[in-house]
Amino acid sequence: MRILADENIPLVHAFFSAFGEIRQLPGRAIVSGSLGDADVLLVRSVTRVDAALLEGSRVRFVGTCTIGTDHLDLDYLRRRGIAWASAPGCNARGVVDYVLGSLLSLAERQGVDLASRCYGVVGAGQVGGRLVEVLRGLGWRVLVCDPPRQALERGDFVDLPTLLRECDVLSVHTPLTHEGAHPTRHLFGREQLARLRPGTWLINASRGAVVDNRALREALAGRTDLQAVLDVWEGEPLVDVALAGLCHIATPHIAGYSLDGKLRGTAQVYRAFCEQQGVPPGVLLDELLPPPWLGELGLDGRADPAWALATLCRAVYDPRRDDADFRRSLEGDEQARRSAFDALRKHYPPRREIDGLRVRLSGEAPRLRQLVRALGAEPV
């Protein structure tokens, strides 16, 4: 069996070498002519998998080590009888850490109490659902908009106009869809952006085209009260430099790039492939994942909860570092910016998730204990 894999998928050899020969290429270099005699194709979101890529190939299994599948032509794969798998939820915790870090940065800049804001989460799947749990666990008011889920289940959902009217913060976590009852391409277009409340913060860590980038650039240029955090962009790896300059935080599609999330993605696709092959998994993620290096952090039980929240989150991750690196990369010409976008992702430094943090609290500290648990850390 021959396996072709994106070179940025971690631990490919550890998980898949027992199945055969592995060849690796940059994700954007995986094209029809590079498939050779591959039976298995392992990709990330930068590789479009469709008839143009696979027609006439030997590929019988496609695995994407990402939560999204908008880069896969699933109808084509089904028609051809090609098995496929993705990694839903693999990086959910990392994205939540990114959103929390962004909120802290915005609050610090504007002198806002995060507990006083109303949060709107658009898309309550693996990532959005996890974010809702954390925000509500912190005791904050959260409204959720997810029309597909609302159509299938009872729940406390609201429509998008209600979110635009009620919420001070909007965090977008939908897949990118172009068809169906609830397409998400340009879900936030000129009309929706014009209806944002004064002082709204808009965070997009889903897919670039869910927000109309041109319309957002115009909105930010015309309304200085709005703030945007963008991790995803239309036209990646080439981004709108003017739009990035108007954002409070701008990053190169790394919100979910925690080490844990990336390894989890490979492991999920590996397990799906083992199931497709009818063999039990022989490799376990726990055997390969390095122990948490965050260690233990001590907090005075009398500490202010807002200060404690910032301290804990920033002990794990602060997106402002990635923002600074990304802005430096936008100074070159078009080709240099394209290359820099991919290079920042390829050479992204290891980052762990807050789940691995242990927090030692002095005294009873019931409020801080609840805060620590809400974040997903372990109070001791």
Curated annotation (Swiss-Prot):
Subcellular location: Cytoplasm
Binding site for NAD(+): Q126, V127, D146, T174, A205, S206, R207, D231, G256
Pfam hit, one: 2-Hacid_dh_C
Record's keyword terms, sorted: Cytoplasm, NAD, Oxidoreductase, Pyridoxine biosynthesis
EC number from the UniProt entry: 1.1.1.290
Pathway where it operates: Cofactor biosynthesis; pyridoxine 5'-phosphate biosynthesis; pyridoxine 5'-phosphate from D-erythrose 4-phosphate: step 2/5
Reaction equation(s) it catalyzes: 4-phospho-D-erythronate + NAD(+) = (R)-3-hydroxy-2-oxo-4-phosphooxybutanoate + NADH + H(+)
Catalytic residue list: R207, E236, H253
GO CC terms in record: cytosol
A GO biological-process term: 'de novo' pyridoxal 5'-phosphate biosynthetic process
EC class: oxidoreductase
Residues noted as binding substrate in the record, renumbered to the chain: S45, T66, Y257
Signal peptide region: none
GO MF terms, alphabetically ordered: 4-phosphoerythronate dehydrogenase activity; NAD binding; protein dimerization activity
Subunit structure: Homodimer.
Record's function text: Catalyzes the oxidation of erythronate-4-phosphate to 3-hydroxy-2-oxo-4-phosphonooxybutanoate.
Family listed: Belongs to the D-isomer specific 2-hydroxyacid dehydrogenase family. PdxB subfamily.
Alphabetical list of NCBIfam families matching this protein: PRK00257.1 (NF001309)
Name of the protein described by the UniProt record: Erythronate-4-phosphate dehydrogenase
Source organism (scientific name): Azotobacter vinelandii (strain DJ / ATCC BAA-1303)
